[in-house]
Amino acid sequence: MATSTTRPPTGEERDQRPLDIQAMRAGAHRLLAEDPKPSVEELGTVALRLREHIVLAVPEVEEMAGRLPHDDTRRACARACIGEARMRMRLKPGATPAARIARAQRLARSVNALCDHYENLDGS
C-alpha cells in the first residue's frame, strides 16, 4: 500500500494563493442573512464548505498574528478567534434541522471573524 507524501503548504506557497475572502464571506452570509436558509438537504454541503473555509483560514491568520509582538491586542484577538473556530469545528451536528442550522451559523460567524482578522492583519 502506498503512503501519502502530501504535506501542508509552506508559508511561501500559501502567499502565492491568497484566500478568496469574497467567496468565504458570501458562503457565510447565506446562513447569517434574513433570506431563506438552505434546505435540510443543502445544509450538509453548506456546513462542509464553511468548515473548509475555516481549515484554510486558520493557518493564514495564525501565521499573520504570529508576526505581531506578543503583547499586541490584535494578536490576542486573532488567537482567540482561532481558538473559537477550532472549538466550533469540533461541534457535532444536532439531531434536528434547527440545531443543524444553528451549528452551521456558528461556523459562518467564525468564517466572518477569520476573514476580518485576515484583512486587518494583512495591513500590519
Model-identified regions with their sequence ranges:
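Short, solvent-exposed, charged loop/turn and helix-capping segments
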Residues: 56-76
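Short terminal alpha-helical segments
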Residues: 2-46
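General structural signal for alpha-helix termini and helix-helix connectors
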Residues: 33-37, 63-70, 87, 91-95
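Amphipathic alpha-helical binding modules
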Residues: 80-124
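Short, well-structured hydrophobic secondary-structure segments
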Residues: 40-59
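Amphipathic, well-ordered alpha-helical segments in soluble domains
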Residues: 24-27, 53, 57, 81, ...
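Short intrinsically disordered terminal tails
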Residues: 1-5, 121-124
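Short, charged, amphipathic alpha-helical segments
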Residues: 44-48, 72-79, 98-105
